[in-house]
């Protein structure tokens, strides 16, 4: 069986971070929303026994067993006693290590595809498996926008209206941020007294005044160029702009699709004129994760389109 789905990127509209726990993780309260952009994940399950293979065309450094999607497939096979060969192909569109959840979303997409292909309906077991793979993975198994608590495993549905966004990802390797470093910088800032800890608060109805990210200040302190990117977004008309997750991607909220498109073009123009290498992405939040669908060849899709267009109107 061969299945395909979109592995959507996400942004954090709210990210509140509690003190470090005994297990080394932090308690979180975060509002995550999926976007209408992401990676295309193609999963083929063979009737025969065999290994897990994962390829990312054009990104050979992401091929192989260390890819989170491949690790998700291996974990699924162990948990549910499956030895059938699995082939994963990822068309990568979400920037890597960008604070947009690309790897976690790919992993969740693989779990969803395998669950459908192999008729696994134990949602609780899948959720537990997702948390073992990564803190953000359970969110991508859920129905859509959600408040997440704990490490990210306690999810509650959130109502978020469609938001038009412009994302700016700095391609400069010197601006890359590892998630572990972002949390460590926050702990150090709090220990020094330069950043006071916040109460995590309770999940509630989304409103723009909630927008915030506890990791932003310590990351900007070490990567001041991020502040310039936030300024680009506000200067282009964003009603608000923050960093997503552990960065380094920043995003702005715009009053409509047209305003967002114009801002994206303006920022791209600034980038060509000298603003350091950045990737500018236009996105909109969505209310549910994409469905898993059977794979169809481009030829069959084209023939269906031709049949539809030839019908009398």
From Swiss-Prot:
Composition bias, Low complexity: 292-304
Classification via SUPFAM superfamilies: GHMP Kinase, C-terminal domain, Ribosomal protein S5 domain 2-like
Entry's Gene Ontology BP terms: isopentenyl diphosphate biosynthetic process, methylerythritol 4-phosphate pathway; terpenoid biosynthetic process
Binding-site positions, ATP: 95-105
Top-level taxon in the UniProt lineage: Bacteria
Family: Belongs to the GHMP kinase family. IspE subfamily.
Protein name (record): 4-diphosphocytidyl-2-C-methyl-D-erythritol kinase
